[in-house]
Design a protein with these regions (language model features):
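Beta-strand-rich binding/interaction modules
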Residues: 102-135, 142-147, 153-164
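Extended substrate-binding grooves/exosites of carbohydrate-active enzymes
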Residues: 1-106, 110-117, 126-128
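Alpha-helix C-cap/termination motif
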Residues: 37-38, 149-151
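Glycine-centered secondary-structure boundary/capping sites
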Residues: 54, 88-89, 139-141, 165-166
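Edge beta-strands of extracellular beta-sandwich domains
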Residues: 166-174
Length: 174
């Protein structure tokens, strides 16, 4: 069934309160988390990935359906970024770091068929950079460990997870 339509039906409210677009993710996130945890649920889909125009039988284009997280010119709308994060197959559940010679980051692999060892994981911590490795089967939770030479020189960790094709699966700043 359908769920979590974008806030497009009340155009006057979008004009007077464009921030309502951010509230969309507040409904999508718990819905998706519950679907993910429920056996037998295969997932869901966005009603329209890209905004539509309507072709009439005579060839005329009429109307505009603003339902997609990507607009008619193929530009991501604000909802796109929330959707990408919520549907991400990689979850980092660590919210804060304790500076140490080894950072430990809790992960969840939400892929169905892909082990996280197939992803390229890159990290930046201050001036230190590197790649990391996580061997987590689909559906598993585990930890990513990053050794640091100078943990005292930074306080934020940037992580990037790229799939075998080079597409970014997700990014985190902790």
């Amino acid at each position: 069934g359908e769920y979590c339509h974008l806030n497009v039906y009340n155009r006057s409210e979008l004009v007077t309160d464009p921030g309502i677009r951010c509230d969309w993710a507040l409904a999508l996130a718990p819905t998706w988390d519950n679907m993910y945890k429920t056996p037998g649920v295969l997932g869901g889909s966005i009603w329209s990935g890209i905004d539509d125009i309507f072709q009439m039988p005579n060839g005329d284009a009429v109307g505009y359906g603003p339902w997609g997280p990507i607009d008619g010119w193929r530009r991501p709308k604000p909802e796109y970024w929330d959707m990408k994060k919520i549907y991400s197959p990689v979850r980092v559940t660590t919210e804060a770091l304790s500076p140490a010679n080894e950072l430990v980051i809790d992960l969840e692999n939400r892929y169905t068929y892909t082990n996280l060892d197939e992803l390229r994981i890159t990290w930046t911590y201050g001036e230190e950079k590197g790649t990391a490795f996580a061997d987590l089967e689909p559906g598993e939770k585990g930890q990513l460990r990053i050794r640091l030479a100078h943990p005292e020189k930074a306080n934020e960790l940037y992580l990037s997870f790229a799939d075998p094709r080079g597409f970014t699966a997700d990014e985190y700043l902790i």
